[in-house]
Curated annotation (Swiss-Prot):
Top-tier EC class: oxidoreductase
Applied use: Artemisinin and derivatives (e.g. artesunate), are antimalarial drugs due to their endoperoxidase properties; they also display multiple pharmacological actions against inflammation,viral infections, and cell and tumor proliferation. Artesunate may be a promising treatment for COVID-19 mediated by the severe acute respiratory syndrome coronavirus 2 (2019-nCoV) (SARS-CoV-2) because of its anti-inflammatory activity, NF-kappaB (nuclear factor kappa B)-coronavirus effect and chloroquine-like endocytosis inhibition mechanism.
One Gene Ontology CC term in the entry: cytosol
Keyword set, alphabetical order: Cytoplasm, NAD, Oxidoreductase
Family in the record: Belongs to the aldehyde dehydrogenase family.
Protein name: Aldehyde dehydrogenase 1
Tissue: Expressed both in apical and sub-apical cells of glandular secretory trichomes. Also present in flower buds and, at low levels, in leaves. Also present in non-glandular trichome cells.
Amino acid sequence: MSSGANGSSKSASHKIKFTKLFINGEFVDSISGNTFDTINPATEEVLATVAEGRKEDIDLAVKAAREAFDNGPWPRMSGEARRKIMLKFADLIDENADELTTLEVIDGGKLFGPVRHFEVPVSSDTFRYFAGAADKIRGATLKMSSNIQAYTLREPIGVVGHIIPWNGPAFMFATKVAPALAAGCTMVIKPAEHTPLTVLFLAHLSKLAGVPDGVINVVNGFGKTAGAAVSSHMDIDMVTFTGSTEVGRTVMQAAALSNLKPVSLELGGKSPLIVFDDADVDKAAEFAILGNFTNKGEMCVAGSRVFVQEGIHDVFVKKLEGAVKAWATRDPFDLATRHGPQNNKQQYDKVLSCINHGKKEGATLVTGGKPFGKKGYYIEPTLFTNVTDDMTIAKEEIFGPVISVLKFKTVEEVIKRANATKYGLASGVFTKNIDVVNTVSRSIRAGAVWVNCYLALDRDAPHGGYKMSGFGREQGLEALEHYLQIKTVATPIYDSPWL
């Protein structure tokens, strides 16, 4: 493991441009005047003081979004016109990639290289993908059984509340905002309190792109105040949320108790990554590392339960151990860095607590498991073996750099154990046997099965969960469906030569 994980001086000198709320096309202070600090997780230093929105600010933002939806141009302009603005937005994201990447690094502890070369380009391409759908939203002509002609209209659902997580603000902004814009919706966005800066900058870019005032509104704040106000607001027509299962339940309850607004939830996971005896061991070990330590393990789809068939267990663990020890922890701006700090102090403490639970419950700590460096929320990449299904580290989502290896014997056994979880977000299968692939992929109760790979996410591939990992789909044209309603229009016809 490499040294030098004390953060970068770049954050101290970087000028933060936007710290207020973004409502009706303008950056404004919160009504109360309250603020909060956002922290650089690599240095534990205050980056900026940000306006704190509460219920009254959400009300103001919803009022702007409602006016923009009911009387503004966005839902009424042609799909082609919306497409052109969204493509301009995508271009502006690319033109400001360095700024967006820097904000992701200093505000969220993410790594400069992966964000600059993957997450930001994927974000802009997500806008391009859904821009391409904006002028292709159409209804259908219906074959009625009587002298009636009918057709369907697909109309935007209205004002949407987006509650965005802290583990990938730019990517999640694009994932939620792009399809909603394509559909013709207006929206209020509540970024995570730990990472508001990227979302505020993206709001600025939306104005430059020509998105009309009131269509995109951003209210920084805390979940129990601003987030709760979004979930329970009587004039928000739909809510999307990405985050923990516990908070997702709260969001769903608030939506039901207010105006019965629909919700789309992408929640927690405890995904199985299954390695069979005939697998390419080197490839499987490589993807097990990527599937758990990418973004410091702060991924809902992390394949943190690595099931290894007994015939290759010891060899696989040895390869995994070497790869974990080589996973370089350094300054997030260093392009050679593979591992950065956890996003915030609360998450840092939670991960360390889970590691301690693993040791107390009898799992074997092979490597890692300790804080790293003198400053910042760094935790060594961690590998446990001799893990059993009843241990906390095998049951609960950790959302950190911790791999648990579990041994299995048969296909039937591993399917049963892989499904013995309240979650169902993703999974991985490594084998050369197509029959095993077919059996396992049809048996695993999860929203994705990645065969001989992992993290195969793409804007054209619908992503979402089974069970307590939520419902609804993001990415793919299926995501657009959440933001559209179907209206049937029927009129009688008289003396028609045919029906």
